[in-house]
Amino acid sequence: MERNSKLINKKFIQYLIPSILTIFAMQFTSLLDAILIGNLIGSTALSASAMCVPIIYIVQMPGLALGIGGSIVVGSLLGKRDVDKANKAFSACIIYGIGVSIIFAILAPIISRPISEMFAEDLREDIYQYVFITLLTDPIIVFALLMSSFMSVDNNPRLATIYFIISDILKISSMFLFIKVFNWGMYGASFSTGFGFLVGAIVIFWYGFSKKRMLKFTFKIKNTFIDLKESLRASGSMAINYLLTAVQMSIINVVISNLVTNIVDLSIYGLICNMVFVFDLISGGIVGVIPTLCGIFNGEKDIYSLKSVTKKIYFMNLISAIIITILVFSLPNVYSILFGFEFVEYQENANMLIRIYVFSFIPYELNRFTTNYYPSINKNAPSYLTVFLRELFFVLPLTLALLYGAGIKGYAVAQVLTELLTVICTYIFIFIIEIKNKQKKSLFMIDDIIYLSYDFSVDNNILNASKVSLEISNFCIKNNIDNRSAQMIGLSAEEMISNIITYGYKNKKQNFIDVNLKKIDNTLILRIRDDGMPFDPTKYEIDNDEKYTTSGIKLVESITNKMQYMRILNLNNTILEINIGGK
């Protein structure tokens, strides 16, 4: 018997689609946001909103970084079946994330005006309005970002998608109302984001009553920082990335707003800066499943699933990046028209700069994969290297040098060089580490299994139950495990799989069950994973009145030393342990 990826592929698609829809909704809304600002308020306002991006990175960092890092840790803990620690990590992220965002909100009246004064005079009032409301509504937005990440990892990816779609619809419709009808200008443009997330939060109440939910908020404030440590470690590269990005973008924006006095060039700069929303329309959603899937599979030490999913994410991300690059390169006119670019006589110049800048997209997405993936498998070095190379060593020197030498064109070229050089250096570093550690020189740095393990999959044919028992028993005996332990674990597997096939599937379609047996020290650990109806065998009680019983479960309980159950990724995970030799 061999392992296949059919069960995991099905689950991958079930998580990938909501992730793509979520990020698509976010990025598409950001695109519409910029389009509405450019068309309803003007090109100067669009440039001002581009200047505000670094501030948005900083104030939303608690939600963005802790959301990703926290979901990696929570997913890993759920994979290790430690629900109590997962609840503590989840609660700590919410408490500290909201706490930091409240500080930003309190500082809004104090720091908004000084921030706007750093920029060119024509942009100051628009920047002040946008920054003030962004800071004021930050607690709402951070809460939304955190909850969407945790809902995804906690068996509810569709709810996270619904939350963003509802919030984004409310944002765009209210933005039009606030700008066009109420004439609130940039106040309205910024306030619409917080308004959308606030009203859309009704979805979080649905999550609270979800039967699939495993995470629970704990109100124990004591020792929350200890519970936060792992999440901070996992989100460290993300946080540094957002912080350094904000710092270098702030420096570049201040230089550009004072160096480039031509309103046409400033408008083109606004066009280029907003291209990141186009970049992430599809690719962002593909990378977005990394914390959930890779974090959980790494926690479970399910190497087969981790390798399978990682390769799919990497190559899908690369292919989508290539497709979007070709589309934008071919249709720069469409892009600039959408954003309300008013200077028709300078269209060719705008097209040239768009075409240069779009070549940064493929290496940009490869770098995004690096910063998201490696923390999920507890290999932070490549992620940190990517962040420091891109945000410190390359982007500022190259951008400032080329800006002074070639203006906005120099800025576009600098971004391409920055992303490309970062990818090359990071990949060289990864392969050096793999060679040094005598690994197989894999880009994904997945460690080999160091214990006895056997993976295979079976379809939901009742005849397979007895075959599984024989397969497992033979494997154990071949690997010098005593006959009694081999028979006990084989019998347990047969009973559990028979129960899954008989009662877990209502339809007669072919479904697959993944089986993993591993020997750690003197313990045999059997994990059975299926996508049948939710059923917790540890809570099963025989009912004398029911027509059919699964009394074999009680037999399994009596012959195993430990039985655990968890519903992870909307999959039943039953774990049985037997001490070898009855020890």
Residues covered by each model-derived region:
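Short alpha-helical transmembrane segments in multi-pass integral membrane proteins
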Residues: M1-L16, V74-T137, V181-S235, C294-F359, ...
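Transmembrane helical elements of multi-pass membrane transporters/channels
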Residues: Q14-D33, I133, S167, G196-G200, ...
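Helix-terminus/linker motif at the lipid-water interface of multi-pass membrane proteins
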Residues: F28-S47, S116-E121, L177-W184, L243-N274, ...
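Small-residue-rich hydrophobic transmembrane alpha-helices
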Residues: L46-F104, A144-L159, I268-L327, L366-S383
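Short runs within selected transmembrane alpha-helices of multi-pass transporters and secretion channels
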Residues: G67, S71, I133-V153, A160-D168, ...
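Flexible, glycine-/charge-rich segments associated with ATP-binding catalytic modules
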Residues: K441-F456, S558-K583
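Conserved short strand/loop->alpha-helix "switch" segment adjacent to the catalytic nucleotide/phosphoryl-transfer site
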Residues: S473-E494
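Glycine-rich/acidic phosphate-handling loop/turn and adjacent ATP-lid/helix
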Residues: L526-T550
